[in-house]
Amino acid sequence: MFRIREAVKDDLDDILSLIKELAQYENMGDQVNCTKDIFYESLFIKKYANALVCEADNKIIGYAIYFYSFSTFLGKGGIYLEDLYVKKDFRNKGIGKEFLKFLAKKCIDNSLGRLEWECLDWNEPSLAFYKKIGAKTL
């Protein structure tokens, strides 16, 4: 069983570790310069972004980083999903879908106009996941 919740300060080490895993997967491991202090300030002091985590057996197995955006065409705010990552051993169990449902509910509850993200064009597993859940390519 797993649960998704808003991240807290004590989650930062685990999230940073997962960010590094994602960066390695995307062949960008050398580009992660974020430290725990920078991350803490950005998330909890300046509130540039928000983080969600997924826990299973009291261990963080995935995370999502998002921030609020704005569409001039819609005249409404939205959510931009910066990162969505689930540890390899926990994939294909519905966790990614639950992260997106959590964010979609935030959009609905706050009358936001969209939930959007980008995916690398070579990331076939992620592209297949997004297609399976009915996401539209813009």
Predicted regions and their residues:
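Conserved GNAT-fold acetyl-CoA-binding loop/helix
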Residues: 16-42
